[in-house]
Amino acid sequence: GQEAEETTAESDNAESCSLLEEGGSRFAYESLDAQEQIWYGEIEQALGEMTDTVKLSTEPIEQGLDEQDIDRIFQCVLIDHPEIFYTTGYTYTKYSRGDRTVGIDFAGTYSLPGEEAVRKAEEIRERASEWLSEIPPDASEYDKVKAVYEKIIFSTDYDLNASDNQNIASVFLG
């Protein structure tokens, strides 16, 4: 017989267009080994598309990864993708035969429905573009980074009671 064990780390859902930004840093991804990078890509795509559930590849399981590795890989995806501000956690379902794990399903959980996440992401992009347009195009790399840093520091008010107090939505949308 096959046994399924479900564990939750939060909950909600939505639609299928990618909200991932192109060309960002892959700092956390680079810290993972090849098997972990497989799951990173699958989790990244699932969260970016707000997919209901994805079956994680079994090769990493065969190479020794298990459900204990999901959270670390999930955190790496969030480190590399602040634009996934609408993700609140995940659930997974582990499939076993005896003591052996034979499959794991992964599902992100979301604070917003898909259309609202898309709308908020667009508002964030527009505000970011406004901020970037204030930087002279001939500024040095250092001056560009400094200008963005100062804009964030001087424009962000921290409100611990705000619903988005720990993500980019609070910085760009207040």
List PLM regions with ranges.
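N-terminal accessory/pre-domain segments preceding catalytic cores
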Residues: 1-140
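Active-site neighborhood of thiol-dependent amide/isopeptide-bond enzymes
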Residues: 141, 151-174
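Short, well-ordered surface patches within globular domains
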Residues: 145
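Conserved hydrophobic/aromatic pocket- or pore-lining residues that grip, position, or stack substrates
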Residues: 148
